[in-house]
Regions:
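Nuclease and nuclease-like effector domains acting on nucleic acids or nucleotide cofactors
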Residues: 8-144, 149-199
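Bacterial N-terminal signal peptides
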Residues: 1-7
Length: 199
């Protein structure tokens, strides 16, 4: 279920570092197998680990672009409880949400991409909420939908694996840091720790 959310993620293990910038704990959702799933999202951004940087470098090179930087945006943690072979069981895992800032050209249809998101976001949030337990909000105001592969460089406006709910303050940080990730020689090209935050 979680792997369908973001195809560019990878499994991570919680660990050291400072607390995440923000955290969202979803409500319990029933799974098709009769179990229960709770989703938790930990928000950065953090510098990518050396392994993530190598993976991003390969991804960019395969598309014919140099890597300018890599941002580790969030970790999505899933905790499942149910039954396996008629016995109670628990399982879980984490998925790192990263963005490879390849030296993509800026697109000319940015307005169309923004308008497409604006016109589709309510339906997108409803669909996301059915799977993960409600689109996050604060004081009745929905959190922003952050485009992992940004619209300015060609990201898909309503692709399931390209939009992540983020609180307003984190969204502001991400929007400030994305241009730095695409700029040459910045901090986002330097490797960070394997586990940048604590639960």
């Amino acid at each position: 279920v979680l792997l369908a959310l973001v195809g560019c993620g990878s499994a991570t293990v919680g660990g050291g570092g400072s607390p995440a910038r923000a955290k969202w704990v979803g409500s319990v959702v029933r799974t098709p197998d009769g179990g229960q799933l709770r989703t938790t999202i930990y928000y950065g951004p953090w510098q990518c680990s050396a392994a993530f940087l190598v993976r991003c470098e390969s991804k960019c090179a395969a598309q014919g672009y140099p890597l300018m930087g890599c941002m580790w945006l969030a970790d999505i943690k899933g905790d499942w409880q149910g039954r396996y072979l008629f016995m109670p069981a628990e399982a879980g895992g984490r998925l790192a949400i990263t963005h490879c800032c390849c030296d993509y050209p800026k697109v000319s249809d940015g307005k169309w991409r923004r308008d497409t998101w604006k016109n589709s976001r309510n339906a997108f949030r409803d669909e996301w909420g059915r799977e993960f337990g409600g689109w996050p909000s604060t004081g009745g105001v929905n959190w922003q939908g952050h485009h992992i592969f940004d619209l300015r460089h060609g990201g898909a406006p309503v692709a399931r694996d390209n939009v992540l709910p983020v609180p307003d303050d984190v969204h502001g940080v991400l929007n400030r840091e994305y241009p730095a990730c695409y700029a040459p020689g910045g901090q986002w090209l330097k490797p960070g720790p394997e586990r940048p935050y604590v639960d």
